[in-house]
């Protein structure tokens, strides 16, 4: 009886013994098969030969599977080659990305340091300007009735503001360059993320296992067994045909049965199989023993024809299933290759944009270096302005100390002049007294016209401040607290100068 083929390449458990008929163990004397039964067996055998289509299909499946095996090997090789190339190019891209990021971070750090130094310089300048702003010019230096003014009122602040505006423009340009570079990096990162995602999905779909070799082995086993089964059916048909030939009236009965099939039965064509005349057959008659042996084998095989046909179809169905699995696997490999090729296409696009990303880094660095030079120049000017204001404030304190020194000098001169006048006045009084005493002692004896100046008073001396030709006034008088504060600041400056 037929059994479904469960193991790959398993041999059929259904066989028709007419392939190489073994000698029967015993024979039944007088075994005969009715002509009607022989005709039925022949027609059934002829119908079974239509199963040759399953064998043809089996051969087609095996050929297709072999082609699929070759195609799968090519697809896997191409996919692995692309994946290997993508992997290496990804490493190169990541190195370039690291370099670009270094340029960006280095520029940011340098920019931050420059801004820090600039802020510090501006803060120092502003502090100095605030000191000028808070230092009021002593009223003693200014015309009477003038509104109070600070030191900053006597200098032009527009230069500082213009310098600050220029620095703001430079900083804005640097930020724009940084933003443009940052946008380029974000685009680069987006490209790399897309590549990583696509490549990750591509590798996830990749599998080194292929079911095709095992399936092909099974398919070849089925095809070989089906060919063997078909050969058995063909031998059985030949045996049936031989039995008809050696049975009187067999040809006529076959033609009649083929021409008038029972209702629902599949028509069978026997043209080309049966000769037109039994008399045309010139064959040696069978011995009784050969006839009985033939009928015994025929009867046994006829009972298994339907099972053999069923097994052929079962094997074909299993082959179709495995063939579908093979085609699905090849389709999966093709899809995987297409996806990998798509990733590679994306990679090509990234490499087309790569020079732009690299040039963005070079442009950012060049622009920043140029801007940094201008910022440093402006920063030096700020520092120069601060030093000018510092010297201005220091000079004002020096002016106060100088005025104080002059005041002290004038006071000393005035004191000396006062003391001198006191001595001169004493000498004058003594001179007057001496002159009077002389006149009293000798005045009666000396003629008046002998020395007309004998009666003159002594000359008088006077010490006074001589104003200059331009009518300059005396040194202004400063409050002691003002002088003290200036002296304190000046001493602090000298101390800081020695420390530095």
Curated annotation (Swiss-Prot):
Alphabetical list of Pfam families matching this protein: ATG17_like (PF04108)
Sequence ranges of Basic residues compositional bias: 491-500
InterPro entries xref list: Atg17 (IPR007240), ATG17-like_dom (IPR045326)
Localization in the cell: Cytoplasm; Preautophagosomal structure membrane
GO process terms (BP): autophagosome assembly; autophagy of mitochondrion; piecemeal microautophagy of the nucleus
Coiled-coil ranges (or none): 157-181, 292-322
Composition-biased stretches (Polar residues): 1-19
Ranges annotated as biased composition (Basic and acidic residues): 481-490
GO cellular component: Atg1/ULK1 kinase complex; phagophore assembly site membrane
Region ranges (Disordered): 1-30, 470-500
GO molecular function annotations of the record: molecular adaptor activity; protein kinase activator activity
Keyword field: Autophagy, Coiled coil, Cytoplasm, Membrane
Signal peptide: none
Membrane topology per record: Peripheral membrane protein
The family this protein is said to belong to: Belongs to the ATG17 family.
Function comment: Autophagy-specific protein that functions in response to autophagy-inducing signals as a scaffold to recruit other ATG proteins to organize pre-autophagosomal structure (PAS) formation. Modulates the timing and magnitude of the autophagy response, such as the size of the sequestering vesicles. Plays particularly a role in pexophagy and nucleophagy.
Protein name per UniProt: Autophagy-related protein 17
Source organism of this protein record: Botryotinia fuckeliana (strain B05.10)
High-level lineage: Eukaryota, Fungi, Dikarya, Ascomycota, Pezizomycotina
